[in-house]
Curated annotation (Swiss-Prot):
Entry annotated with the keyword Disulfide bond: no
GO CC terms in record: cytoplasm
Keyword Cytoplasm: yes
Annotated source species: Streptococcus agalactiae serotype V (strain ATCC BAA-611 / 2603 V/R)
UniProt-annotated binding residues for ATP: 11-14, 54, 58, 162, 168, 171
Main localization, broad class: cytoplasm
Pathway(s) it belongs to: Pyrimidine metabolism; CTP biosynthesis via de novo pathway; UDP from UMP (UMPK route): step 1/1
Name assigned to this protein: Uridylate kinase
Binding site for UMP: 53, 73, 134-141
Highest classification ranks of the organism: Bacteria, Bacillati, Bacillota, Bacilli, Lactobacillales
The protein's role, per its UniProt record: Catalyzes the reversible phosphorylation of UMP to UDP.
UniProt-recorded Gene Ontology molecular function terms: ATP binding; UMP kinase activity
EC number in record: 2.7.4.22
Entry keyword set: Allosteric enzyme, ATP-binding, Cytoplasm, Kinase, Nucleotide-binding, Pyrimidine biosynthesis, Transferase
Length: 242
């Protein structure tokens, strides 16, 4: 079956790497995620990754507790680099040539982010893991994902969620009558105020015609199903459903 998308960016939360522990990095969990990503990669799909850092650090609560916000955000960026290095190692163990590129130069452990080099890696069937956000405070890893997806001309951002199987009109944990959307447009997401990504990330995705697929990553095989075009989760695009 021909993949629906040829080049994708997968956005993982940092908590996804923590497993049942909720914090830190659980290596078996990382290996399980890496195995699934490697299988999709081996089908010929070009893949980039952005991983959050919430399993290790959260800048906003630290700032609210009195830490300088800029310093707090930079600390969080370093957390995303740790996650990127661990994921890259697991992908390498599954035989996938992988590169880590960081927005803040740290040549001893990773390449500096260079768009042209990232594109060449993808064209050579390497996975690229982007770390350190966009290198500036006040920007989320959602914005990083949208910006990098636009820069590498990805067709879709796969928002892999922990236990969340799509986008609802209300919180399904609080409202038994919450309805899941199969499809939405970027404009509808912004108008409804649905918190899939922050506003900056949503606008970048809309302006660059990048599909956004929100799905439950806890079900094995879901990444592959999304890439093959199966209707799971919620797909957000510029095209209204017919």
């Amino acid at each position: 079956m021909e993949p629906k998308y040829q080049r994708i960016l997968i956005k993982l939360s940092g908590e996804a790497l923590a497993g049942d522990k909720g914090v830190g990095i659980d290596i078996p969990t990382v290996q399980s995620i890496a195995k699934e990503i490697a299988e999709v990669h081996n089908s010929g799909v070009q893949i980039a990754l952005v991983i959050g850092g919430g399993n290790l650090w959260r800048g906003e609560p630290a700032a609210e507790a009195g830490m300088d916000r800029v310093q707090a955000d930079y600390t969080g960026m370093l957390g995303t680099v740790m996650n990127a290095l661990v994921m890259a190692d697991s992908l390498q163990q599954y035989g996938v040539d992988t590169r880590v590129q960081t927005a803040i130069p740290m040549q001893t452990v990773a390449e500096p982010y260079v768009r042209g080099r990232a594109l060449r890696h993808l064209e050579k069937n390497r996975i690229v893991v982007f770390g350190a956000g966009i290198g500036s405070p006040y920007f989320s890893t959602d914005t990083t994902a949208a910006l990098r997806a636009a820069e590498i001309e990805a067709e879709a951002i796969l928002m892999a969620k922990n236990g969340v199987d799509g986008v609802y009109n209300a919180d399904p944990k609080k409202d038994a009558n919450a309805v899941k959307f199969d499809e939405l447009t970027h404009v509808e997401v912004i108008k409804r105020g649905l918190k899939i990504m922050d506003a900056t990330a949503s606008t970048i995705s809309m302006d660059n015609d990048i599909d956004l697929v929100v799905f439950n990553m806890n079900e094995t095989g879901n990444i592959k199903r999304v890439v093959l075009g199966e209707q799971i989760g919620t797909t957000v695009s510029n095209k209204a459903s017919e």
